[in-house]
Amino acid sequence: MEKRELVNIIDYTLLHPTANKADIESFLQEVVNYGFKTIFVQPYFVPFAVNWLADHDVNVGVPVGFSLGGATTHVKVEETKEAIRNGAKEIDMLVNLGALKSGDYQMVETDIAKVVEAANGLNTKVIIETALLNQEEKISVTECIIRAGADFVKTATGFNGGGATVEDVRLLNEIGKGKIQVKAAGGIKTYEDALAIIDAGATRIGSSGAIQIIRGETSTSSY
């Protein structure tokens, strides 16, 4: 895959907590200049991004339950509905890590299913923070995600330690057995990293350093 083709599978992201409106506007100009198909911004900036990109074929995505996943299901559902009203076209939700670590997989699955229902057919990806999980947890939560009807399992936010590895992407792809796609995010810093992750089975990549990757440079971003 050529570097420029990566714009079709990279979700270009600006979720830094100190990003302001001017930063978002510069980011959106880069999105248009490079031809990215999907982007992610914080919920506050979704209306601005949707309006700014009105004449361009770009999906604006939003994180839900970001970045720790501990919000109640009701809060995640309402966050999803508001984001959609504001024009969001993709949802990346964080799994309830506390419930997962407590072994309450029924709650984990219900939490995801309710957000999937609220998304009403839009692409829904579930972030599991692979660096914080053991292998049994990775398997169990991915099975929950499949049963809940989400479209993707996503490796990480990049904010909570660790990120995508070839081994984790390969494992999630094997667990998914074609029933769910894998989005890799966190720690993908070079074009070579991206190719290795794709070869392992990822069909989508999340990165705030996408332009550096496409240029053949090394991204300095952790997410």
Curated annotation (Swiss-Prot):
Catalytically driven reaction(s): 2-deoxy-D-ribose 5-phosphate = D-glyceraldehyde 3-phosphate + acetaldehyde
Family matches, as CDD domains: DeoC (cd00959)
Alphabetical list of SMART domains matching this protein: DeoC
GO biological process, one term: deoxyribonucleotide catabolic process
Pfam families per UniProt: DeoC
Gene3D superfamilies registered for this protein in UniProt: Aldolase class I (3.20.20.70)
Residues at the catalytic site: 92, 154, 183
Protein localization: Cytoplasm
EC number: 4.1.2.4
Keywords: Cytoplasm, Lyase, Schiff base
Presence of keyword Lyase: yes
GO molecular function: deoxyribose-phosphate aldolase activity
Gene Ontology cellular-component terms listed: cytoplasm
First-listed, main subcellular location of the protein, grouped into a coarse class: cytoplasm
Pathway of action: Carbohydrate degradation; 2-deoxy-D-ribose 1-phosphate degradation; D-glyceraldehyde 3-phosphate and acetaldehyde from 2-deoxy-alpha-D-ribose 1-phosphate: step 2/2
Domain of life: Bacteria
Family: Belongs to the DeoC/FbaB aldolase family. DeoC type 1 subfamily.
Function of the protein: Catalyzes a reversible aldol reaction between acetaldehyde and D-glyceraldehyde 3-phosphate to generate 2-deoxy-D-ribose 5-phosphate.
Protein name as annotated: Deoxyribose-phosphate aldolase 2
Organism of this sequence: Oceanobacillus iheyensis (strain DSM 14371 / CIP 107618 / JCM 11309 / KCTC 3954 / HTE831)
Name of the encoding gene: deoC2
